[in-house]
Amino acid sequence: ALSSAASDVYKRQITYVEHGVCDMGVVGKDTIMEMQGKFFELVDIGFGRCKFALATKKGSTFYGGFDVKTVATKYPNITRRFFEAKGMDVDIIKIEGSVELAPLLELADGIVDIVETGTTLKENGLEVIEDVCPISARLIVNMVSMKMRQQEIENFVKLVEENIDK
């Protein structure tokens, strides 16, 4: 997981690209999904691969019963859309820092967070019960720049795609 300082850099980068300060930038799909800016997402660069996942205490029955579940996350927009797509009503608590502590402190029934290896979850007695979506670094482009500098950008994108380890 990224530190909050790194996360702020990516958020600023989206803002800079969206408002034309930069033509292009590289940001994580997590930041793109959470912020939903106005830009083009052109290439999955492929590094920083991990996933968003729903995790609970081992042995919990998150999907059982009729009570509204509480979910802790750093990513409330992504979490809300995930559960809306399932037709599930959940309470979302936005937490910065160690989200995995929320179920242990009985603050939440589960968490939605970035998972790379799952080690931190296991260390805290949690398990992934559902993958939300894969994430990785993406190349984004300002919408006006794409129109004004289309050939240059397409040439650059082609170069990037030719050099991505697949």
Predicted regions and their residues:
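Ligand-binding "clamshell"
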Residues: 34-44, 119-134
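Short, hydrophobic alpha-helical packing/hinge segments within bilobed ligand-binding/sensory domains
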Residues: 13-14, 101-104
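Glycine/small-residue-rich loop that forms an oxyanion/phosphate-binding "nest" at active or ligand-binding sites
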Residues: 13-49
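Small-molecule pocket liners
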Residues: 6, 48-54, 134-139
